[in-house]
Amino acid sequence: CAGGKLDPTAIRVADLAKTTQDPLLAKIRASLRKNHSFCRDLKRPLGISAIYSIEPRQGKATGGLACSGYGSAVTVTAAFGFAATSTCLNQITNR
């Protein structure tokens, strides 16, 4: 989730099991392990690429916005989109 993030250089691509600083990805990871028979070993990769930011959230939630009320800087949301597109294209072309 890009909410509450300001630094586009903190975006990373990694296996879903290795992501940090993202409560939404943590919920997805827990759901996959609990409801869909994914490996419960926290040290093993899940085999799913995820785009996330290592930057802690900035500011306080104000409510009513996406990502639990945190706003987003356009530079961060754009960088998330570019990272996601690059990851998809690399996987499609097997790089």
Go through each PLM region and give its residues:
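Glycine-rich phosphate/adenylate-binding loop
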Residues: 10, 17-95
